[in-house]
Amino acid sequence: MTIHVGDRIPEVTLKRIREGMETIDTHALFDSRKAVLFGVPGAFTPTCSARHLPGFIEQFPEFRHRGIEVFCMAVNDPFVMKAWGESQQVPDGLQLLSDGNGEFTRALGLEMDASSSGMGIRSRRFALYVDCLLYTSP
């Protein structure tokens, strides 16, 4: 079932690398904050690297000015997400999250099968505005 406006963000664990590997509970991550969460089919893929992530990087100062945190998620491992962030010069504060097994993507109902391209199950392209665990309209 696909997430709808008014639904709570599902509780699963994601990974990210900062100083070291971190395991993050999505409810702990999105509780008591306003955030944009956007998903991409894959790090280093042409459209994600040339348009999707750069668009959010460009708008990041405006989100930050409004007190909105920004998170990018993909069904990739955390090492790939870290390398992609470095290659794209992602600014501090824009966080890249790894949904390596696609659990969060499936729980959101936003998975797609890219097996025909040799990529397996991936995230659809999406953006959600989250306010204290709830998917809302900004």
Indicate residue ranges for each PLM-predicted region.
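A short beta-strand-turn-helix
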Residues: 14-34
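N-proximal helix/coil linker or "cap" segments that precede and/or mark the start of modular domains
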Residues: 1-16
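A short, hydrophobic beta-strand/beta-hairpin element that forms part of a small beta-sheet core
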Residues: 125-134
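Short active-site neighborhood of thiol/selenol oxidoreductases, capturing the structured segment around
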Residues: 29-49
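Structural microenvironment flanking redox-active thiols in thiol-disulfide oxidoreductases
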Residues: 49-89
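Short loop/turn microsegments at loop-to-beta-strand junctions
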Residues: 10, 36, 124-125
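Conserved small/polar residues in nucleotide/adenosyl-binding loops
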Residues: 45, 135-138
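Short, internal strand/loop/helix patches
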Residues: 89-120
